[in-house]
Each structure stands twice: as structure tokens, then as C-alpha cells.
Amino acid sequence: MKLIDSGLSGYEDMLDRQLEIFERIKEGSGDDTLIVTRHRPVITLGKSARIDDLLFPLDIIEEKGVSVRKVGRGGGTTYHGPGQLVLYPICDLRNFDKDLRTFIRNLEKVMKKTANCFDLSTKILDE
């Protein structure tokens, strides 16, 4: 698996990079990749989120330097910002577990074990 440490990045730039890697993997010319990054302040709204879910008015949030973006992923509202490590695995699941849910659960277990090595407490939802 290829590892990319992109440092601090903008959300849109990182999304574009993920899509490029995904297309190469889909075409058979790319490697499974893990991107490690930290984002500039951004709140992403997944498919089930609404702008009304925000705790403060949009103009106040943006005034504080936080971008708000509607994104194509599932789920609700998520904040990303400096100091928060974000990992994006981009993989051909045929090389791993074919069941997406099993693949995600395995990633969660690895992250939990890693965090525990640093004496960080974790909780996996639905565990």
C-alpha cells in the first residue's frame, strides 16, 4: 500500500486528489493508497445532514474561518481542522475483504489498537 503524507491541506484539494487516485485504481494503473492529512478548518455535511444542523448561523461560522461544504459521503456533520489527523484509505476492495462493512470494521479496530498504544481512549460506535 502506498502512503502519502500530505501535511495540512484544503478539503477540496484533498477530495480531488482522492478522486484521481480512485480513478487510477479503477483503471488498474494505481496502487492502493493511504493518505494521511490534516485539514484547514472545514465542516462537511454528508447526505443525511442539513445546513440547519449547524449549531451557529453559517455566516458566523465562515466569519471564524471555517468552510462549510456539502459532500457526497454518507452520514451527518463532521468537523475537520488543524491538529486532527485524518486518514483516507483508497483501495480496491477485491484485494481485501469484499464486504465494505467488514473492511471498515477492520480499519476501526486497527485505529483503536493504535490509539491505545498511545494511552488514548477510544470507542467504536455500534460495538
At which residue positions do the language-model features occur?
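N-terminal lobe of the biotin/lipoate ligase/transferase fold
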Residues: 1-126
